[in-house]
Amino acid sequence: MSGGKPRSNTRTVAMLAGVVVLMGALSWAAVPFYSWFCKVTGFAGTTNVAEAASDTVLDEKIRVRFDANADSNLGWTFRPMQREMELKIGENAIAFYEAINNTDEPVTGTASYNVAPDAAGYFFNKIECFCFTEQTLQPGERVEMPVSFFVDADLVNDRDAVIRDITLSYTFHRTDPPAPKQAALDAKTEPTVN
């Protein structure tokens, strides 16, 4: 009888180790899978990236509103240069956002984005966008950043998507750590030991 007990413990330990490995693998895969899922379905307002402008333009119009936010530690003023525009569905449009670095140091930031309502993400296509790369602004620098986009004509064929207004929203986040000014001052005042 004692021969069965160690084998049972070994099996239990192996199963528990397998569960731990499986949970770790699922945790690791969750983020890329969720990103892929959002891009494919437009879930959570995730937009598409298009290679070129739409070749189908309809007479039906849609209104796109623009929203901008900046993380408090960024030190930038960030705003849309126009609050909204009306365009034909399928028409290529360009909107501009303005960013000003209000600090006395270079600051690098990146923009996260989404559209509302969430269902519009599947039909909203960006061709070019400042959000595709990091942006570095020098002290006091002001830039106008374009986003080129269109709303896919398939929107009118989706009977579940009764969308006539879309909000494109960006939030800029700092990507480089703030300069440790106090540490630099402390280093200058510390006595050197020989």
Swiss-Prot record:
GO terms for biological process: respiratory chain complex IV assembly. GO terms for cellular component: plasma membrane. Residues 34-194 are periplasmic. InterPro entries: CtaG/Cox11_dom_sf, Cyt_c_oxidase_assmbl_CtaG. GO terms for molecular function: copper ion binding. Residues 1-12 are cytoplasmic. It is found in: Cell inner membrane. Keywords: Cell inner membrane, Cell membrane, Copper, Membrane, Signal-anchor, Transmembrane, Transmembrane helix. It comes from the Bacteria. It is a single-pass type II membrane protein. The keyword Membrane applies. Belongs to the COX11/CtaG family. Exerts its effect at some terminal stage of cytochrome c oxidase synthesis, probably by being involved in the insertion of the copper B into subunit I. PANTHER family: CYTOCHROME C OXIDASE ASSEMBLY PROTEIN COX11, MITOCHONDRIAL-RELATED, CYTOCHROME C OXIDASE ASSEMBLY PROTEIN COX11-RELATED. This is Cytochrome c oxidase assembly protein CtaG. It comes from Paracoccus denitrificans. The lineage of its organism: Bacteria, Pseudomonadati, Pseudomonadota, Alphaproteobacteria, Rhodobacterales. The gene is ctaG.
